[in-house]
Amino acid sequence: MSHLHSKRIFASARARAASLLGLLAVCATATLVAACGSGGSGSTSSSDAAKAPLAVVTPVVDCSKLAAIDITDIGGAGSTITSATVTTATVNGASVNFCTVKGTLAPSNTFEVALPVSGWTQRFAALGCGGLCGNVSDPTQQSSFSFSYTCPLVQQGGFATAATDMGHSGNDASWATDPQKQADFAYRGQHITTLTAEKLIKTYYGQAQKYAYFVGCSDGGREALMAAQRYPNDYNGIIAGAPAAHFQIQNSLYHGWSVKSQSTTGDSTGNAVLYADKALVLHKAVVAACGGQAGVPDGLIADPRTCNFDPASIQCPQGATNTSSCLTAAEVATASKIYGGPVDATTGERMLAGSPQPGSEENWVGVEVPTTNSTDAPVPVTKLFSYMIVTGAYNLIFTGSPTMPTIDTFGYTDASFYPTYLQANHPLMDATSPDLSAFHKAGGKLILWHGWADQHISPLFTIQYFEAMQNTMGASNVSDFARMYLVPGVGHCGGGEGFPNIDLVSQITAWAEQGTAPNAVMTYQTDSSNNVTASRPVYPYPAVAQFSGTGDWHSGANWTQGSPLYNEPTHTWAGSSFYTSYSPATQGVAAP
């Protein structure tokens, strides 16, 4: 597989950066479809999931009648439905009618519920929200379930769906000094929206759904794990993609370190050191050194933890006048800092579970590095997404702290930053408690997935969470209800050079409804017309896909399960205690 042309990369990156804080919201609403391809070798196909004995159910009342439904028992006084009308959406080229219900759950949780007028298969899916949320994704747009070209349950309007803005409007956290809005964003908004959707379903169809699912990516992945931890009976199956479960760490130390590493002055007053063109130079060198681990020349790194690439290996010779194909000493230092992450100055202990991994460099553009080339320098680090998400989340993370730190005063080299600034809101905002015993007991199924080339959230945090689950509950118990998939070359909630089209909806429905646990899941690359150009299986962690050695390596049929390439547990780091069991905190109006 050839590398993407640099012009295409930079154009794509500019488009990503243009959406700034809204980027993650877009990613999260795409999750359910990003989980809809066709089944592959050793996997459960979409058609298998469709064989579940669930009859199509038709409405028993007119859509307009739902406008009169009282939802104050769920959201409290002031909760109201504002409209209930039949709308038409284009799904897979066909027109599909939905009873679209809009409303507000007090004090300010705006929601939309989409109920298929025909073809409902007794399934419900709540859709996660990304970034700092603040907008309601249109749940009638089944095409927003990206990559659903072979998932008939989604394409044919088989799911009732719901989405919420989680209690506020806008992508910053200016609202976050309000304790109730903190709670609505942290955990309450999705839960009460689900209860409302279920009430509407029961009224509209004359019966409850048979199966309920939650699908989210990024913050939507955090919301997914929050549901499993706090409301274990809400969903039969949960898909948590690239979860920002460590919300506070992610939006302070993690992204803040990217800014500090990039700055010519070491703080937010400086300009960027590493630019888009040099990120591509770095990426080419990394994949040349570490790509092809699966036995084919595809430029993908099957497990970046085995890649010991040193940026100094491509440092420009002293006195070089043309540095377009090498890194300057300053650029080498910046890249090394981004990979290495911060450490405690006294103990040498790492401050983070992980950083952006080798092979993710192309995806740094617009996040860790500017969208422009080094010839367009200087660009202030305040233009980076990493800076914007950190400063946008100040109020949400540090309200109630002894002082309000800034991106320049975070304890990047002082482990006491965790108990001093992040511990207080940890049980409220984070979703890192590894004890999912109640969810397991309720029969729930969980699929975690993460792209190895994620530019926003290091996959090592997700590995840390999965390992914590195994250490807390026992590996055999975890295997009974949870799987984790790590996808080489795939960026944050999709994209990248890898195989981003992955069918997880059929996997979770088959597991929850038929008891068929997922194993190999086929992933796909497609062209601009959405035609499949290559396929490859991905296996439950820690196994990797390995080319069989015969046939076309672009065909997933010629791949098998390989042994893990890396067998060490996640290193101890300053925030490791955040991944031990704790009692979730609540505040404000209690959720039903």
Annotate each predicted stretch with a short phrase.
Residues 207-218:
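Alpha/beta-hydrolase fold nucleophile elbow
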Residues 32-35:
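C-terminal motif of bacterial Sec signal peptides marking the signal peptidase cleavage site
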Residues 226-228, 233-343, 486, 503-506:
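A catalytic-pocket lid/entrance helix-loop region that shapes and gates access to the active site
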Residues 130-206, 252-253, 260, 404-428, ...:
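Cap/lid segment of the alpha/beta-hydrolase catalytic domain
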Residues 41-123, 127, 135-141, 147-149, ...:
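Catalytic-loop region of hydrolases
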Residues 448-450:
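Short beta-strand/loop motif that positions the catalytic acidic residue
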